[in-house]
Amino acid sequence: MIKYVVIIPARLKSTRLPNKPILKIKGKPLIYWTWKNCVKAFDAKKVYVATDDNQIKTVCNEFNINVIMTSAKCKTGTDRIAEASKNRFKDHLIINVQ
C-alpha cells in the first residue's frame, strides 16, 4: 500500500486577502473548511496544515487538525510543503492542497 500524507500550506500574509485562513465562513475559519473537505477523501490522521503562524496553529488545535510548524522563510506554499515533509515523510506520496 502506498504511504501518503495530505499537506495544506497556510499563512496569514497574503497580499490579496490578508488573514485568509482564519477568516470565518458560516462561523468557522476557512482553514477548517479546507481541512473538512480533505478528510472527506482522505484519512483525517493523514491530513496536515503546514504553517509558520501561531494564530493558525491555535485555530487548527481548536478543531483537532494536525499542524506542522515551518519557518517563515518559505516563499511559496510548495516551499512550505517541502519543508514540512522533508524529514518526516521521506517515503510518502505528498498531496499538496492549495
Describe these PLM feature segments.
Residues 54-98:
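Short phosphate-binding loop-to-helix
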Residues 2-50:
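N-terminal glycine-rich phosphate-binding loop and ensuing alpha1 helix
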